[in-house]
Amino acid sequence: MLCVIARIDPGARERLAALRRTGETWDSRTGELYGHITLATYVGDAEDRFIASCRELLSGCRTFSVRYGRIELLPATSILVASPDKEGALLALHDAIAEKWSGALDRWTGDERWKPHTTLLYDPDGDLAAAEAVLRKKFSPFTARVERIEFSRVEETGYTIVDHVDLPA
């Protein structure tokens, strides 16, 4: 499995990490906040062609803004997330990848079910609804910049960034 991820700027990553460190004790299985939005998850067997195709789609792409507008609980996957608006360059980039590779993307990123987000907490056994209430009170909408697109291979434990594209300003 290979993910195409939009990496947000350091200030936005710190803002989301600080939100997680609200003084509450989370019994969470979430590791350190990496600060990204998954655009697509490729499950095919031609990774090199997929990366080359995505690089081609990115050739005219510049840094762009995303607006984080809300905190949401996604119960089907036991995660609490910060969600950017599904619009603009973020949506256009997702749709371009999905149009070209729809048959080789997972069910969550290949079509209109795609829900852009940055995971804040993962805990299938915890009280995420209580955590959601706390984080919603402390959250204020903000704008982040996407400065880099990375290709991340999911491993047994963790992930490996196998390639990236730095977006020009």
Region locations from a protein language model:
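Short, conserved acidic/polar surface loops in the N-terminal third of protein domains
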Residues: 77-78, 93
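Low-complexity, intrinsically disordered Gly/Pro/Thr-rich segments
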Residues: 135-137, 145-154
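Short proline/glycine- and acidic-rich turn/helix-capping motifs at secondary-structure junctions
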Residues: 69-77, 111-116, 149-159
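Pocket-edge structural micro-motifs
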Residues: 41, 83, 153
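Basic, often amphipathic N-terminal segments
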Residues: 1-65, 87-143, 160-169
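Residue-level signal for tight coil/turn positions that link beta-strands
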Residues: 8-10, 75-77, 146
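Short histidine-centered catalytic/ligand-binding loop motif
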Residues: 79-86
